[in-house]
Amino acid sequence: DKGGSFLNGKDAGPAFQIQGEYAGKRTGVQVIALGDGKFRAVIHKGGLPGAGWDKGKKIELNGAATTTGADFPKANDWAVRITGAKLRLTVPGADAQTLEVVDRKSPTLGSDPPKGAIVLFDGTDAKQFKPGKITKDGLLEQGANSVRHFQSHRLHVEFRLPFMPKARGQGRANSGCYLQGRYEVQMLDSFGLTGKNNECGGIYTIKAPDVNMCL
């Protein structure tokens, strides 16, 4: 739409193909689309978050789209060039590295519910929610509360986020899942960011996620 919100990657243009994660033997880079052909590259020494990053200081570079990908001009001897599915990283005091795009997924994505689990939603009906509505794509519409109440429990939730490159912070696909009506687990696009308590997976105002796994 005019605000730059997309539900389908095919409609999002080339920026959606450039945004993502790139991995090498000793470095990981997350590239964030910022709209209007602009990007930010976040360089992690050791590997991607949750996959080798040493949790040290990150290096950030600003760049722009080219006819073949994106270029991030040199800053403090670091530079990035993306061509297709490959990222060329210039590293100070070392040989340049070639990183390839990776598509990480949660190991629990699509997993079967364990024995004895209560399935609240499987895409067939929304009877376990009030009000409960299903979108034309078979997803549970936001604004629904479970009919049943729970105390101590483990909840498995799968969700998708729209691609909103021009939005920033809490305006980037912001939503949440309330537990017991009081603890809000953040659901928003915080890809490439620090991972604070108001970002994806954080318990709002209470606890930051152990690792930012917004993929």
Can you describe what each PLM-predicted range is?
Residues 1-7, 25-28:
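Charged, amphipathic alpha-helical segments
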Residues 3-9, 14-16, 34-38, 42-215:
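Carbohydrate-interacting regions of secretory-pathway proteins
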Residues 16-20, 27-28:
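Mature N-terminal, pre-catalytic/accessory segment of carbohydrate-active enzymes
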